[in-house]
From Swiss-Prot:
Name of the protein this chain belongs to: Enolase
Top-level taxonomic group: Archaea
Catalytic function, reaction form: (2R)-2-phosphoglycerate = phosphoenolpyruvate + H2O
Active site (UniProt): 210, 340
GO CC terms in record: cell surface; extracellular region; phosphopyruvate hydratase complex
Binding note for cofactor: Binds a second Mg(2+) ion via substrate during catalysis.
Cofactor(s) the record lists: Mg(2+)
EC numbers: 4.2.1.11
Length: 432
């Protein structure tokens, strides 16, 4: 018998840096046929308690954030077990990683180790198959480009200002192509920069972790009003062309049954009232983590009150976990799933979470992390899985624009067969 070109010949890893200058894991997979795949694990600032554990060294070097132990495990424990395995058997390989780790939260090998390696395997197999990664993962029918969610005003743990909610986003959905949507977003971002500089001074246009601005604002309403002004100044229609979104990251605001928002201690009901008022006043179609990750009742109340106008998205609540998706669906606690491969630690488990959501009528949104890298894997994943949206920051900073540039490239590759997901969101806006 001849050599299987897809057989894994060599696996290795090394320590590289993410966009915050923190170490992370990069994995390589080389196949017998000569193809090379790679993947880099991102890292979040606000993390759900049930996420896969990042394995870090501790101690004094790299301020305790080194990943040399994770890289060593990849090179000495994992690599020998993968040699000779067919890289097309993604699920088998990911199950082997889960088995080798042997913990419920990947605390032995580290979710950063397994994420980087899982991505690298898929990229190697796609290269050997002479396919674009999105086509390898999604098949010949993968042709829909997601709606970009652009985090252009930062708050919470992503910024040093007084805004409690973590992200304020523009959502250019009312366009015929991804390219047109990005043009509108970039123009709006530019107008926002000018507005903020005029109103708050030059320091207001310094950018945060995800490329958004961190102006000295104090209220969500102030941020949303400014976004509407920027959309209009750019020549677009708020609501019908560019909608708005919020990631409250409410777990960061929660303590002892109350939510600390804008100098007030709010009950679940009071916080929901705030969201209702904001949705009534502004074209908000996306609301992520409106309540704490354990507050299923809060999420359910948000779905009951707002889901005809706004997608209620679980991030910390669901942590890309298929079982959590099923539980939340049974309680009618979400209408959207945020997908972060490193939350669960393997591509296979992330795909299972997406399928669990799809089976239950829950849309999915593929997402970056605040500590990200030049790896563009999530752009291909979004197209492959027909994600409604992709969340990957402002149109600034290379680790953010790399994903947008990959999506622009994919749209170009697809040519006339490319579709844009924007029209799907018009149904939500049409109910306003």
């Amino acid at each position: 018998m001849g050599v299987n070109d897809f057989a894994i010949e060599r696996v290795w890893g090394l320590q590289v840096l993410d966009s915050r200058g923190n170490p992370t894991v990069k994995a390589y997979v080389k196949l017998a046929g000569g193809s090379l795949g790679w993947g880099i694990a991102p890292s979040g600032a606000s993390r759900g308690e049930r996420e896969a554990v990042e394995l870090r060294d501790g101690g004094g070097k790299w301020r305790g954030k080194g990943v040399s132990r994770a890289v060593s495990l990849l090179n000495t424990v994992v690599a020998p077990r993968l040699e000779g395995v067919d890289a097309r058997r993604q699920a088998q390989i990911d199950r082997l990683l889960i088995e080798l780790d042997g913990t419920p939260n990947k605390s032995r090998l580290g979710g950063n180790t397994t994420t980087a390696l899982s991505i690298a395997v898929s990229r190697a197999a796609a290269a050997q198959a002479r396919l674009e990664l999105f086509q390898y993962l999604g098949g010949a029918g993968a042709r829909r480009l997601p709606i970009p969610l652009l985090n252009v005003i930062n708050g919470g743990v992503h910024a040093g200002n007084e805004l409690d909610f973590q992200e304020f986003m523009i959502i250019p959905y009312g366009f015929e192509s991804f390219t047109e949507a990005m043009r509108a977003a970039v123009e709006t971002y530019g107008e926002l920069k000018s507005l903020l500089k005029d109103r708050y001074g030059a320091s207001a246009v310094n950018v945060g972790d995800e490329g958004g601005f961190a102006p000295p604002m104090r209220s969500a309403e102030e941020a949303l009003k400014t976004l509407v002004d920027a959309v209009e100044k750019a020549g677009y229609q708020p609501g019908s062309e560019i909608a708005l979104g919020i990631d409250a990251a409410a777990s960061q605001l929660y303590s002892n049954g109350r939510y600390s928002v804008e100098g007030k201690s709010l009950s679940r009901e009071e916080l929901l009232s705030l969201y209702q008022r904001l949705v009534e006043q502004y074209p908000i179609v996306y609301l992520e983590d409106p309540f704490s990750e354990d507050d299923y009742e809060g999420f359910k109340a948000a779905v009951d009150a707002l889901s005809t106008e706004t997608i209620i998205v679980g991030d910390d609540l669901l942590v890309t976990n298929p079982q959590r998706v099923k539980e939340a669906s049974a309680l009618k606690a979400v209408t959207g799933l945020l997908v972060k491969v490193n939350q669960v630690g393997t591509l296979t488990e992330a795909l299972e979470a997406i399928q669990a959501a799809r089976d239950r009528g829950i849309v999915h949104i593929v997402s970056h992390r605040s500590g990200d890298t030049e790896d563009t894997f999530i752009a291909d994943l979004a197209v492959a899985t027909e994600a409604l949206m992709i969340k990957t920051g402002a149109p600034a900073r290379g680790e953010r624009t790399s994903k947008y540039n990959r999506l622009l490239e994919i749209e170009n590759i697809l040519g006339y067969s490319a579709e844009y997901a924007g029209p799907e969101l018009r149904g939500v806006m049409g109910r306003r």
